[in-house]
Amino acid sequence: MRYHGICWFIFQAAIIFAIFGSCQGAFRHQFKTAEQDGFARRNRDLAKFQKENLNWNGLFQLNSISYNSGVVSGVFEQQSENGENQHLFPFSISFLKNDVVRFQMDEKSRLEGTVEYEKNILTKRRFDASTELGFNERAEVYGKDAHLLEQTSTSLTIRYGSHGRFTVIVTFSPFKVEFQRDGEPQVVLNERHLLNMEYYRPKSSRTPEQEANGMWDETFDNFHDSKPKGPESVGLDIKFVDYGNVYGVPEHTSSLSLKETNNSDAGYTEPYRLYNVDLFEYEVDSPMSQYGAIPFMQAHKPNSDVAVFWSNAAATWIDVEKESGPSPHSQSTSTHWYSESGTLDLFIFLGPKASDVYESYSALVGRPLLPPLFSIGYHQCRWNYVSEEDVLNVDAKFDEVDMPYDTIWLDIEYASKRRYFTWDKATFPNPKAMLEKLDSKSRKLIVILDPHIKNDPNYFVSKELIDYNYAVKDKSGVDNYNADCWPGNSVWVDFFNPEAQAWWGSLYEFDRFESDKNLWIWNDMNEPSVFRGPETSMHRDAIHYGGWEHRDIHNIYGHKCINGTYNGLIKRGEGAVRPFILTRSFFAGTSALAANWIGDTMTTWEHLRGSIPTVLTNGISGMAFSGADVAGFFGNPDAELFVRWYETAIFYPFFRAHAHIDTKRREPWLYGEPYTSLVRELLRIRYRLLPTWYTAFYNSHTHGFPILYPQFLMHPEDEEGFAIDDQFYVGDSGLLVKPVTHPSIDKITIYLADDEVYFDLHDHTEYAGKGHQVVPAPLGRVPVLLRGGNILITRERIRRAAELTRNDPFTLTIAVSKIGKNASGFLYLDDGVTFNYKKGEYLIRHFSYENGILTMKDSHSNPPVSPKYSSSQKHLKVERINIYGEQTRKSIKIRKIIDSEVTEWDVSVDDSGCIRNPQLFLV
């Protein structure tokens, strides 16, 4: 079937669209729709053809298949369009550790290098993102838990998994792979026969029809893409059986539960797109690309989760469609994934719980980082603080108005002529002295350093980059890729060259960049952003080290940039100190290296609302340390929006105020009273909760969990909450947050998923009963409820900066459950700075309350506890205990269990439910 011919009509329509554009979004015309992206158009046409020809069995036939030692191996074959040649595609289905299955497919001719390109500098094989990113090292085949149950002439069945609950059924013709759990289908590959891998064609064989379909070159927005390797897209349909809600594939401003992309009333007309771009003043509620790309999708139904990870670094689109499920009144979700180039590399996770999915997925791509303590405090930024005097005045003003904060940031104007790794000495004559003054208060400075380098022979970074041949090349493969960015004419670091990445890291050394130990890094514009480039980015036919076109690696360019920065900062700190990096661009695994923010928001209520599902989606997809600019990057918020955004942002994992250079100054005291006092108290709430936040980050680091739990994750059985994305929990602390995101209201409705009792964190009011509850929400009071059955751990003493709290005592707030009158919680502690926690220098204390007994237990796990560190923390204690939900209790027993030694004593409870100075020390 010559599927390329199907799209001729759509191609003509795309030309009309390109001429007349769209009236939605001020800059939408700069970015491709699926119909304007040749490979996307071809794959969507394939899907359209399948719907119109239901008896069609796909492009491929099975040539051979076998099973041995945990791997199904086989070969597909496909006839060329003229019927003269047979093309072979080896594939495998591998059974890995952690109950993960991997489906891979490649193209024999490119894999073996028998193809011929006009440019000999190009690598002949397809790009393998998993190899480049180190995923293969963690994707170990583990055949011990995989057993061939049956092989016939038509199918092959394998049982796998540590508990033997999972089954894979491979049907030979037409080819289909069904994944079952406990005998029930969960995920099906190629049910619609949309498996596609465009085979190599000599350019001399091209036809006018292929030219029209963008197979050999394309022009968009007057930018020409030469496509010297011809068509090489990959595609596959993936069905989530009996799952009506799917989540993930950030970064988008869509809802948490992904919408359909088939023109349905509640959905979109475009697929979700993964192509990292510099998208300013972006639309809310859109499947358009943003700054990051994680091709991870999770499906959820009552008490069941599955997921897939599509390991591909090229431009990718995902169609989502709902259909009737196998159960009465149920839905299944059919998805169609297609990427411009690369291999087909899919990982399948069958849960059954979300925690199982996150454990296995993060073990593959890398656990989220455990950040330094200061970085989960408050960050003050704008474009730009204009001088040392400006920086130090802002710093002093925070102390004057008694507001805590941890970092102040410098945007591009600090650097001489925007030449990174330099200082404008007219405005920053003595940066080290400035850093020392900040350090005296345990505060940090974070500066922007972007991967575009001013093309200037008198600039040492530019000279070295060019002299060492470390820059990205244009399509010739000889000349450096030159274009404009913030410094004017620029060249870009080629982070795919290991030597270039190491050189980039060396620029952070103290003898190369005038700085100090309390200076950390912001890598922006690393999509990469290119002014007046195609779709605000680099030409897809630019060439990177190794002979890869930019199209092959685009979505991981930012990740490789961050990898170089991270390694450089590790070396700068002699391997002892945890770095802090903020990135705008990201991919799967970037969370092991950096935090991110969601880019150039606008100061509107709509953008405030949209930030919540975006941050939630980033989190469940692995990018846990995420946040949005307070109170929007573009524009000047009124006082109400300003305060409401702070109310929301104190519950982002990453909490930073930032604003455009053309906005009015908006440090948190500039709106005057009563707003200054309102924001002050909001900042203090964030700092009181630092122990809770840090413990949530520890859980994320050790298990891959998000920092913020969506409703479906906290209440996996409650179908009413599966699509809720305007409220969330802070880790497993029991804190339920419902930000106010509309103007002129003083109360809000919170959805409670169960009959448990919930306590208002502000005045301890009790709410109970499944359903919607109305709670007060005057300006400055963010609605936060503490769910019964939890123990909240805080530090009530407010210091200038987070690190200054490390010796302060703790407060326990015990919210007893409705049934059983019990509660639990736990606390993680380390020095908040170094990697010494890997040597056992940390404390974990588990608290439980039942029958009037509060038990504190040492829950330290591997590596063994460091006696020296433990001894150094003997001063830490609980100074106060609050009990909610047991108004009549007059005393409780405290039980302390450390190293199997049990100590008990009784303490009195006053009429307010408070125990002061209970003499409970952590060690």
Curated annotation (Swiss-Prot):
One Gene Ontology term, aspect cellular component: endoplasmic reticulum
Localization per record: Endoplasmic reticulum
GO biological process, one term: carbohydrate metabolic process
Signal peptide: 1-25
Catalytic activity: N(4)-(alpha-D-Glc-(1->3)-alpha-D-Man-(1->2)-alpha-D-Man-(1->2)-alpha-D-Man-(1->3)-[alpha-D-Man-(1->2)-alpha-D-Man-(1->3)-[alpha-D-Man-(1->2)-alpha-D-Man-(1->6)]-alpha-D-Man-(1->6)]-beta-D-Man-(1->4)-beta-D-GlcNAc-(1->4)-beta-D-GlcNAc)-L-asparaginyl-[protein] + H2O = N(4)-(alpha-D-Man-(1->2)-alpha-D-Man-(1->2)-alpha-D-Man-(1->3)-[alpha-D-Man-(1->2)-alpha-D-Man-(1->3)-[alpha-D-Man-(1->2)-alpha-D-Man-(1->6)]-alpha-D-Man-(1->6)]-beta-D-Man-(1->4)-beta-D-GlcNAc-(1->4)-beta-D-GlcNAc)-L-asparaginyl-[protein] (N-glucan mannose isomer 9A1,2,3B1,2,3) + beta-D-glucose; N(4)-(alpha-D-Glc-(1->3)-alpha-D-Glc-(1->3)-alpha-D-Man-(1->2)-alpha-D-Man-(1->2)-alpha-D-Man-(1->3)-[alpha-D-Man-(1->2)-alpha-D-Man-(1->3)-[alpha-D-Man-(1->2)-alpha-D-Man-(1->6)]-alpha-D-Man-(1->6)]-beta-D-Man-(1->4)-beta-D-GlcNAc-(1->4)-beta-D-GlcNAc)-L-asparaginyl-[protein] + H2O = N(4)-(alpha-D-Glc-(1->3)-alpha-D-Man-(1->2)-alpha-D-Man-(1->2)-alpha-D-Man-(1->3)-[alpha-D-Man-(1->2)-alpha-D-Man-(1->3)-[alpha-D-Man-(1->2)-alpha-D-Man-(1->6)]-alpha-D-Man-(1->6)]-beta-D-Man-(1->4)-beta-D-GlcNAc-(1->4)-beta-D-GlcNAc)-L-asparaginyl-[protein] + beta-D-glucose
Principal location listed in the UniProt entry: endoplasmic reticulum
Active site: 524, 527, 600
Stored CDD domains: GH31_GANC_GANAB_alpha, GH31_N
Swiss-Prot/TrEMBL keywords: Endoplasmic reticulum, Glycoprotein, Glycosidase, Hydrolase, Signal
Pathway where this protein functions: Glycan metabolism; N-glycan metabolism
Residues with glycosylation annotation: 262, 563, 822
Entry EC number(s): 3.2.1.207
Enzyme class: hydrolase
InterPro entries: DUF5110, Gal_mutarotase_sf_dom, Glyco_hydro_31_C, Glyco_hydro_31_N_dom, Glyco_hydro_31_TIM, Glyco_hydro_b, Glycoside_hydrolase_SF
Keyword Thylakoid among UniProt keywords: no
Family listed: Belongs to the glycosyl hydrolase 31 family.
Function of the molecule: Catalytic subunit of glucosidase 2, which cleaves sequentially the 2 innermost alpha-1,3-linked glucose residues from the Glc(2)Man(9)GlcNAc(2) oligosaccharide precursor of immature glycoproteins.
Subunit-level organization: Heterodimer of a catalytic subunit alpha (gls2) and a subunit beta (gtb1).
Annotated protein name in UniProt: Glucosidase 2 subunit alpha
Lineage, top ranks: Eukaryota, Fungi, Dikarya, Ascomycota, Taphrinomycotina
Record gene name: gls2
